[in-house]
Amino acid sequence: MSAVNTPADFNDYKVADMSLAAWGRRETFIAESEMPALMGLRRKYAAEQPLKGAKILGCIHMTIQTAVLIETLVALGAEVRWSSCNIFSTQDQAAAAIAAAGIPVFAWKGETEEEYEWCLEQTILKDGAPWDANMILDDGGDLTELLHKKYPAILDRVHGVTEETTTGVHRLLDMLAKGELKIPAINVNDSVTKSKNDNKYGCRHSLNDAIKRGTDHLLSGKQALVIGYGDVGKGSSQSLRQEGMIVKVSEVDPICAMQACMDGFEVVSPFIDGVNDGTEASIDKALLGKIDLIVTTTGNVNVCDANMLKALKKRAVVCNIGHFDNEIDTAFMRKNWAWEEVKPQVHKVHRTGAGAFDAQNDDYLILLAEGRLVNLGNATGHPSRIMDGSFANQVLAQIFLFGQKYADLSPAQKAERLTVEVLPKKLDEEVALEMVRGFGGVVTQLTKTQADYIGVTVEGPFKPHAYRY
């Protein structure tokens, strides 16, 4: 898509401001130059058109990088309808650029919960009736859940869903275990070129950026507590350490806790002896009373609960880089404490009660992005080079599932293929190779003798399925 050239009669969209489209297009051009894997897939599959006939319902953060993803899907033959998976994550110039290209999109930064639900519905509906979609691309699982609960008939012709995040994958696995999942899914999140890039290196880049944009604080010498040490927690801990913070980590998984120790982080618990009995008496107030910044990274619920929030140091910064706002008990904060907006997505939450507050009061917490994704609420998320790997995985996963034609199978065949699986390793390696080439790197090829010696082919895949990178 080379220019802003909206069809005169096109109105199948809702964005904040169409005058931002030219700006969004300029930023998209820059992003394309930083996304070699995605652009490589456009070139590689342009003639083949592997997504011709695909009608994709997409729900993922409507950023500049997502604009490149959307236009790659379209370039490979797909039709799409799009919304954002987070009320604060849309970059309005990106949404405008996509609408200007004649692609249905329903997203703007600062949606209410009701508007968010409306946007999801508009993704599904065309001219007031369910669109004849046959593929889903999701981030977090809200779109997938809505289709299963409210529009199950659509799923009869859907070949599958590709899911971007840890949270969404958990929801899919739960649905599968309960017998509720009606279509196969590709777990894009656990592709190596997604989890090690997006979750780890992306958070390493974007977390400190968001905190500094939101607060203008110097982070050096201050104490941080990172809740969780999975890939997101690892990247987040590195992000804060490289700013000079004294970083402590809280974990429930002994293996991840061991990794944190080996990486040089002190493993602590906000609860005395690690046990949360639901009372304030179980809180390690001495620890939390020294914490200047707390970051949740888990994808789990209430990992920063009301009792922890009560015990935190005055004026501490609280934020989340997991998925939903329920990692932090923001419901308790809204019910019991007064909120003062400093600027969009930055609030002073006064712990002196729910009524009027004294602006000079110093017993407050600084909450970023209302407990939602801080890197997209207070900044622009991961850089294009990081999202290149994630979105190249999405494209290959869409091609793979669309080619499997699940909706056309017999009931017996469907029963066999109703799974939640990661992308085949060979495709993961294809993404990685394009990314390495984008850096100007050269990958060494095995000789036939070397390949035979370790039991692989010269072309790969090079590692067994269970290999942990």
UniProtKB/Swiss-Prot annotation:
Pathway: Amino-acid biosynthesis; L-homocysteine biosynthesis; L-homocysteine from S-adenosyl-L-homocysteine: step 1/1. It catalyses: S-adenosyl-L-homocysteine + H2O = L-homocysteine + adenosine. It is found in: Cytoplasm. It comes from the Bacteria. One of its GO terms (molecular function) is adenosylhomocysteinase activity. One of its GO terms (cellular component) is cytosol. Its cofactor is NAD(+). This is Adenosylhomocysteinase. InterPro entries: Adenosylhomocyst_ase-like_sf, Adenosylhomocysteinase-like, Ado_hCys_hydrolase_NAD-bd, NAD(P)-bd_dom_sf, S-Ado-L-homoCys_hydrolase_CS. The lineage of its organism: Bacteria, Pseudomonadati, Pseudomonadota, Gammaproteobacteria, Pseudomonadales. NAD(+) binds at residues 165-167, 199, 228-233, 251, 300, 321-323, 375. It holds the Pfam family AdoHcyase. Binds 1 NAD(+) per subunit. The keyword Hydrolase applies. The keyword NAD applies. It comes from Pseudomonas fluorescens (strain SBW25). CDD domains: SAHH. GO terms for biological process: L-homocysteine biosynthetic process; one-carbon metabolic process; S-adenosylmethionine cycle.
